[in-house]
């Protein structure tokens, strides 16, 4: 590779076509470091996670907040490994109706980890898409059980918005198309 001083990057790359990887990496590196932490970059897929410093501070409030942060960060990394650009947002002191967890490629979204059965999926989707101001919801599902797919389809029909999901063991993010 080239050993180009950072101050010369724009001059060197000017007029050259950027690969998607270079564009993603430039976006990842260009965030305001006073506001965002560069948390994760997936070299294989060019996805990334940047986290608001306020969100990291919130995770120190309690053991439960730390566990919630770690679960949500794990979900963000799965999205990044599937090629998505994730902004992981702080949760406290946000306007009512604007309490989604992340943006995924600029789309306001909430993260929902389903640990039991499929019974709460529609309720989770409604909360994310209506009460929390999301345009999408990302579900982590524990298995490929048909009941989960049926509930996701019902949620998509009833709630609108976009629904992404992945199976915990597979970690391949898919969007539900209805």
Each language-model region and where it sits:
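Short acidic/glycine-enriched loop/turn segments that link adjacent beta-strands
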Residues: 95-98
């Amino acid at each position: 590779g080239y050993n180009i001083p950072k101050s010369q990057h724009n001059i060197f790359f000017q007029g050259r076509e950027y690969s998607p990887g270079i564009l993603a990496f430039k976006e990842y590196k260009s965030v305001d470091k006073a506001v965002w932490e560069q948390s994760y970059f997936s070299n294989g897929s060019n996805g990334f996670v940047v986290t608001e410093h306020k969100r990291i501070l919130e995770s120190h409030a309690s053991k439960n907040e730390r566990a919630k942060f770690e679960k949500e960060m794990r979900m963000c990394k799965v999205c990044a490994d599937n090629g998505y650009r994730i902004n992981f947002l702080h949760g406290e002191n946000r306007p009512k109706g604007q309490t989604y967890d992340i943006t995924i490629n600029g789309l306001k979204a909430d993260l929902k980890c389903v640990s039991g059965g499929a019974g709460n999926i529609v309720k989770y989707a409604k909360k994310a898409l209506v009460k929390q101001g999301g345009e999408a919801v990302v579900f982590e599902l524990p298995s490929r059980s048909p009941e989960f797919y049926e509930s996701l389809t019902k949620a998509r029909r009833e709630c609108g918005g976009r629904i992404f999901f992945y199976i915990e063991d597979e970690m391949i993010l898919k969007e539900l198309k209805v």
